[in-house]
Amino acid sequence: MDSLVESGWKYLVTHFSDFQLACIGSFILHESVFFLSGLPYIFLERTGFLSNYKIQTKSNTPEAQGKCIARLLLYHCCVNLPLMMASYPVFRFMGMESSFPLPSWKVVSAQILFYFIIEDFVFYWGHRILHTKWLYKNVHSVHHEYATPFGLTSEYAHPAEILFLGFATIVGPALTGPHLITLWLWMMLRVIETVEAHCGYHFPWSPSNFLPLYGGSLILMWESFAYSADFHDYHHRLLYTKSGNYSSTFVYMDWIFGTDKGYRKLKALKET
């Protein structure tokens, strides 16, 4: 496996410059992972396949789905790509490299765990700020246009929000100056995670069923509580008020600061 990865990476660094890999390569990888992981949920919603796992009974119209895709392509090309290009000198200054040797899996794993933790913390507070009345009305309400979210709506947002919350995603890598392959793996995992959180389905194989604190189970000495993709779906069904699930990946921040109380009460009522 290592030799396969090394061979593939050798081909990339031989045929492309650092700038091309870090900017154009990252953009192509992001678009590929994002749409390949998100488009299947449009198929599920349109066909009704696996509808017993759908969180809401309502579905989006093909027109609404098409609008989302068109806006995403526009913003990805006009906001995301320029942002990647503009941030390249910063990452290079902080130590990012693409040359050999490749980092060990221990280093990669430790860095990505750090990125998830710091991204979740920064995203939580940034997301709460976006739910203040003025910012919600003028910026964040764009993301909440889809009260019935599907995978691709995870990145459907106002350009200002893309820049604002995008900081949470890049702050970890900017601090550590990782190898580009680590940055790519982090980006892939983060994209898959946010698509899953907005997918509108909760399957038996959903990660939240198996990974503690990952939008899943919060187990304490005195209680346990099961979260799921339904937690963020609940967030989209409500207005800018305290609707919870401000975190991006984990659930402990919502629990610590009490922003999961409304969801927990709703779950308790449904179970009685």
Swiss-Prot record:
Expression sites by tissue: Strongly expressed in leaves, flowers, siliques and developing seeds.
Motif Histidine box-3 positions after renumbering to this chain: 231-237
Reaction catalysed by this enzyme: 4,4-dimethyl-5alpha-cholest-7-en-3beta-ol + 6 Fe(II)-[cytochrome b5] + 3 O2 + 5 H(+) = 4alpha-carboxy-4beta-methyl-5alpha-cholest-7-ene-3beta-ol + 6 Fe(III)-[cytochrome b5] + 4 H2O; 24-methylidenelophenol + 6 Fe(II)-[cytochrome b5] + 3 O2 + 5 H(+) = 4alpha-carboxy-ergosta-7,24(24(1))-dien-3beta-ol + 6 Fe(III)-[cytochrome b5] + 4 H2O
Cofactor: Fe cation
Residue span(s) of domain Fatty acid hydroxylase: 113-259
Motif window: Histidine box-1: 127-131
One Pfam assignment: FA_hydroxylase
Record-listed E.C. numbers: 1.14.18.11, 1.14.18.9
Membrane-topology annotation of the record: Multi-pass membrane protein
Family designation: Belongs to the sterol desaturase family.
Protein name: Methylsterol monooxygenase 2-1
Organism: Arabidopsis thaliana
